[in-house]
Structure formats: C-alpha cells, structure tokens
C-alpha cells in the first residue's frame, strides 16, 4: 500500500556563492508552475534587499511545489533554500537536517570551491542523498568533463551521469526534477507517534507573531494543540499551521509526518523558537528531542554607537527589531567615555556583522560608528578564576593574569597552484600553523591551517582575495582555545587612556600596530593651543609616541627693534600661559579620528 509520504520529496540546494543556486531554484519554481509568469522575478527566494544585491542567501526559506512526474504520479516537493556562507553553518546544518536529499550545484567554469566542500561534508554527515548537477554549461569556458572528474576525486561522488544544465537558459531542468523523484528517498516517520518537529528557521510576522519553520518527523500538528519546546520547556497554543508558496503563506488543516511548513502560536520573540529545537505535543510529549541542537554562541564582538543625528533609542529599537528575525544577534548596552552610549553586539562571524551593520544603515536609516571587532578571549587569573572577555576594557590588570587564550579556527583554503606561495606567506604572517596540503587534479591546492580567529577577523578575506587575484576561496570552523602571548594596547592622549581605542593584540605585532595608530591619530587630531602627546602603551610601558605640536601666537610681532630682555619677558609669559593651558585644556577628539583608526585596524 502506498503511504502518503511516498510522494513527498524534501531537498535543498547546496552551492558556493555565484554557482547558480538561486537561479536553479527560480527555474524549478517556474517549471512546477508555482508562480504565474507575471509574478516570476529573479531570485524569488531571496527576499531581503541585501540578499539580492550581494547575491547571497542569508535566511533559509522553504517552498512547497507540486510536480507531475513522467510516471504519471503527482509528487509534492519541499525545496528548502539554505544560506551558503560560513557564518551561517549552523543554520545550514539545521536546514539540511530537515531534508532527505541535496542537489549539489557546481559551476562548470569554476569547479569545486571551499564552501561547496564545507556544505557537502555537512550534507554527508546528515546522510543525505546527494545529486551532483553541473550548471552554466551554456558558457563557452565550461569544462563539464573536468568538473565531473573533480567531483569524483575531491568528494568521492559518482558524477558520471550528473545532469548538465543551464539554470539561466532553462536547459535540462526537467532532468533534475526527475532525478529528485528517482534518487531522493521519501521521508520516513510515523504520523501515529507523538509529535516531533524540527525548527529550522523562524520569522517574525507583524500579524501572526513568530512563525516557526518546521519539518515534521513524527506525529501530526494542528491548530488548538498545545505544543512544547523541548530545549526550554516553554508551552504555546497553536493558532495556525500551513505551508509555503513562493512569497505566500497558505494555511491548512494539519501538518503530518514528512511535511515542511510553518506553525504560528502567538509566540512573542524569536528567542523562544530556537533554530534546531524540537517541538512536541505538551499533552503527549516525545521521549527525546531530535539530535543536533546547540545554543549559538557569538564569536565576534564589536561596539555599535549612534553618531550624527541618530538617537540611542532609535538604535535600540532597530536592534530589537533585527533580533526578532535573527536569534543569533546578541547585544547589551555599553557606554564609552569617547563615544557616549551605545551597544556591545555579538555576531556569528564577519559576514553576519557586516550584514547587521548594513541593515541598520539601510533599512533603518541610522548613522552608526562601529568599534574594531574583537573576539572572545579566555583569561585565567592568578587566583584560578576563568573569565571570558569580549571587550578589551574589561581585561583585568596584567599582574592578575596567569594566562590568556584566544579562539583558534581551522581554515580551509582552495587556491590555484600559482598563488600557493603568496597564500602560505599570508597565513604565516597571520600566525597560521600549517596542517595539510593536498592537490585537486594538478591545478588547484587545498591548504589547511590552524589560525587565531583574531587574525581572520580584521581583513583576512580581502588580503586573501587580493593576493590570489580573487581566485582563492576560504572557509573556517572554530576548533577551540589555545594559549597565546597577548597584550592589551592602550592609547593615551594627553596622559588619559581613550577607552574606545584599546584593543588586545599579539605581543609580536604590538609595536607595528601602535606605530601606525599614533601616526594616524597625529594626522587626524587638529592642533590645539598647547601640545598634545599621543602615546601607545602596554601596561605602563610606552612603546610609541607622537606629539601634536601647539599653535602659537607670534607675541614678538609688535617689538620691532628693541631690547632682547623685553622679548624674553613676552616669550616667558607665553610659555607660562601654555603650561597652564596644558594642565587644564581639554582635547577635542573628532569622530573622524576614531573612524580613521578603526578603519586602519582593518
């Protein structure tokens, strides 16, 4: 007897940036007739303006499509669109857990890239059936046969009969759909067991509250049921369930095992629907949650302060709204003597940080200034206490610190042969430890390094691209903490420490860094009527200094000839005045000076 599930296929599309994932999704949506031609637009699933502009997918999306296969049966497809970027690896892994299969899109002109690898390994960990598809075969520079061989060599997937498609021209898309029906297994699961549903994303809707995007593994969920989140124990009453059509929510009576859809239960914040959590029936709960849930910890921190005509309250409101849709964003109020009141924010990684900053500026029209990004250090004090420090100003004094550890990542870099030297040199400059090197065919190399996250946070990505003329691709994962010789560098202006400019740096690099900063500040701080010393120090030892010279009035202008003692008297008087001014004068540090130094940090 055929079960209802036998006609369901849950799958996602994995690809490196720009290999044509969203375009393929567009074609599949078009072919299955989910949208009329009038509603069709490019990158249907990328709803955020930034997603379209950068050509990246940030939030996971899911759509239900109906497909009449060549065997005459009608199938239900659930296409779950995943983010492709390293910062969102956890979201990707949850989206993959909601599927039984994945389509691996590889660009016929580029071959395999670092992020493709990272996501494929994730898919293999979840035991997904992977269908390799070679895209962009309409381009003159396409080399499908080499790419097939590459897929076999590097990933070990049989790609001999991989569909050759062009998502842009719509060539061979049917073949992909038939392969989905043929190769991807239908969902397992039993709708008579207690409810188990995996949350793989959540979205805040102004009318319905938080919508949890779920994949139902066992059981049934329908309105008026009481559901329970297994990680927090919070309970809610379901108000509506349904599934997704592109850009629309379609309410339905129930979601059964194997279905992908949404649950609305008048939940107030996204915090309550944690990605990766299991939803179960409060009256008949499941014994244990689905595996793989973990709490997201921010890896990169920076301060965000309002500037110009932006008010603190506006910034707070904007961050709260962003947080509704972005459970990984963390922020707490912070004040700095130099920048006033603002927030300390935590992010999953660099791209996440950039996107949040960009959304604040674009969607909420705010003027903000961000301090240099820092990572979370683990500090062991001499009395044995262990602290996690994300803000250099909170570091205990040097005499109380027993050891400092910094987060390390495993970086995988794929690079063409001719740039290997340059890239290895870059990794060494960034205190990387060489681990492994392997060749793909004869033209490309996979390098594996262990590196401090701190070195990647600044501008590793840009440096990598510029030294490899844009050909290298890169992926990283956190592996743990390692002890390191770190110091806190303070910048003193006229003898006072400026908190916004303090940062933690490796001892070997402290001097160059300090030199650069004091020189930059000297250019940026306007001259006052007294001289201003700018010093960079570690503890009480000054390691670099510049002085902004004083402006002086020409007091001798009115003495034409005259006696030298008269001139001396006037000069002495001026000197006295300057000395007094220096004691009581305040230094105005313009906002531009901060910006310049923080940019130089990069």
From Swiss-Prot:
Instruction: Tell me its EC number(s), please.
Output: 3.6.5.n1
Taxonomically, which superkingdom? Answer: Bacteria
What keyword terms does UniProt attach to this protein?
Cell membrane, GTP-binding, Hydrolase, Membrane, Nucleotide-binding, Protein biosynthesis
The enzyme's main class, written as a single word, is hydrolase
One annotated GO molecular function: ribosome binding
Keyword Cell division listed? The answer is no
In the UniProt record, which is one GO cellular component term? plasma membrane
For biological process, the GO terms are:
positive regulation of translation
Q: According to its UniProt record, which reaction does this protein catalyse? A: GTP + H2O = GDP + phosphate + H(+)
Annotated positions binding GTP: 18-23, 135-138
Q: What is its main location?
A: membrane
Which InterPro entries has this protein been placed in? EF-4, EFG_III/V, EFG_V-like, EFTu-like_2, G_TR_CS, LepA_C_sf, LepA_CTD, LepA_IV
Gene3D superfamilies from the UniProt entry:
3.30.70.240, Elongation factor 4, C-terminal domain (3.30.70.2570), Elongation Factor G (Translational Gtpase), domain 3 (3.30.70.870), P-loop containing nucleotide triphosphate hydrolases (3.40.50.300), Translation factors (2.40.30.10)
Ranges of residues in domain tr-type G? 6-188
Q: Does the keyword Hydrolase apply?
A: yes
Where would you find this protein in the cell?
A: Cell membrane
> What membrane topology is annotated for this entry?
Peripheral membrane protein
**Record-linked NCBIfam families:** lepA, small_GTP
Instruction: Say which family it is in.
Output: Belongs to the TRAFAC class translation factor GTPase superfamily. Classic translation factor GTPase family. LepA subfamily.
Q: What's its job?
A: Required for accurate and efficient protein synthesis under certain stress conditions. May act as a fidelity factor of the translation reaction, by catalyzing a one-codon backward translocation of tRNAs on improperly translocated ribosomes. Back-translocation proceeds from a post-translocation (POST) complex to a pre-translocation (PRE) complex, thus giving elongation factor G a second chance to translocate the tRNAs correctly. Binds to ribosomes in a GTP-dependent manner.
Question: What's the name of the protein?
Answer: Elongation factor 4
UniProt source species: Caldicellulosiruptor saccharolyticus (strain ATCC 43494 / DSM 8903 / Tp8T 6331)
């Amino acid at each position: 007897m055929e079960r209802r599930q036998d006609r369901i296929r849950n799958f996602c599309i994995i690809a490196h940036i720009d290999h044509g994932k969203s375009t393929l999704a567009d074609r599949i949506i078009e072919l299955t007739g989910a949208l009329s031609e009038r509603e069709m637009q490019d990158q249907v699933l990328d709803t955020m303006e930034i997603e379209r502009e950068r050509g990246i997918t940030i939030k996971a999306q899911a759509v239900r499509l109906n497909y009449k296969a060549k065997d005459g049966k009608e199938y239900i497809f659930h296409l779950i669109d995943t983010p492709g970027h390293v910062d969102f690896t956890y979201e990707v892994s949850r989206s993959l857990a909601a599927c039984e299969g994945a389509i691996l899109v590889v660009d016929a002109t580029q071959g395999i890239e670092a992020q493709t690898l990272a996501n494929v390994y994730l898919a293999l960990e979840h035991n997904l059936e992977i269908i390799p598809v070679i895209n962009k075969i309409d381009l003159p520079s396409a080399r499908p046969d080499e790419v097939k061989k590459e897929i076999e060599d590097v990933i070990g997937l049989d790609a001999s009969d991989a569909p050759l498609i062009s998502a842009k021209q719509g060539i061979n898309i049917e073949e992909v759909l038939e392969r989905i029906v043929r190769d991807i297994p239908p969902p397992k699961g039993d709708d008579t067991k207690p409810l188990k549903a995996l949350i793989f994303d959540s979205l805040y809707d102004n009318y319905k509250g938080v919508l949890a995007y779920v994949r139902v593994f066992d059981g049934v969920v329908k309105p008026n049921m009481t559901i329970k989140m297994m990680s927090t124990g919070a309970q809610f009453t379901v108000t509506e369930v349904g599934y997704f059509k592109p850009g629309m929510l379609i309410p339905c009576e129930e979601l059964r095992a194997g279905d992908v859809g949404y649950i609305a239960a008048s939940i107030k914040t996204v915090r309550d629907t944690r990605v990766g959590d299991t939803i179960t029936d409060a009256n008949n709960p499941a014994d244990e949650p689905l595996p793989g849930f973990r709490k997201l910890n921010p890896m990169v921190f920076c301060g965000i302060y309002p500037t110009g005509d932006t008010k603190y309250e506006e910034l707070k409101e904007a961050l709260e709204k962003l947080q509704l849709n972005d459970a990984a964003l963390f922020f707490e109020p912070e004040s700095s003597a130099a920048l006033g009141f603002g927030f300390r924010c935590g992010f999953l990684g660099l791209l996440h940080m950039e996107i949040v900053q960009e959304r604040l500026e674009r969607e909420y029209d705010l003027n903000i200034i961000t301090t240099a990004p820092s990572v979370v250090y683990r500090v062991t004090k001499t009395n044995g206490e262990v602290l996690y420090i994300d803000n250099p100003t909170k570091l205990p004094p040097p005499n109380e610190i027993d050891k400092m550890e910094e987060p390390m990542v495993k970086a995988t870099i794929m690079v063409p042969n001719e740039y290997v030297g340059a890239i290895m040199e870059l990794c060494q400059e960034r205190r990387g430890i060489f681990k492994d090197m392997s060749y793909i065919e004869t033209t490309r190399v996979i390098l594996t390094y262990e590196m401090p996250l701190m070195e990647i946070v600044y501008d590793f990505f840009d440096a990598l691209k510029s030294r490899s003329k844009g050909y290298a691709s890169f992926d990283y994962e956190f592996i743990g903490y390692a002890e390191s010789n770190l110091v806190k560098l303070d910048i003193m202006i006229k003898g006072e420490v400026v908190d916004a400019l303090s940062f933690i740096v490796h001892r070997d690099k402290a001097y160059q860094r300090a030199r650069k900063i004091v020189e930059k500040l000297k250019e940026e701080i306007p001259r006052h009527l007294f001289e201003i010393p700018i010093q960079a120090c570690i503890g009480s030892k000054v390691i670099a200094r510049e002085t902004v010279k004083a402006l002086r009035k020409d007091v001798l202008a009115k003495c034409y000839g005259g006696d030298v003692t008269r001139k001396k008297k006037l000069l002495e008087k001026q000197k006295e005045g300057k000395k007094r001014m220096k004691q009581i004068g305040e230094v105005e540090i313009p906002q531009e000076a901060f910006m310049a130094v923080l940019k130089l940090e990069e």
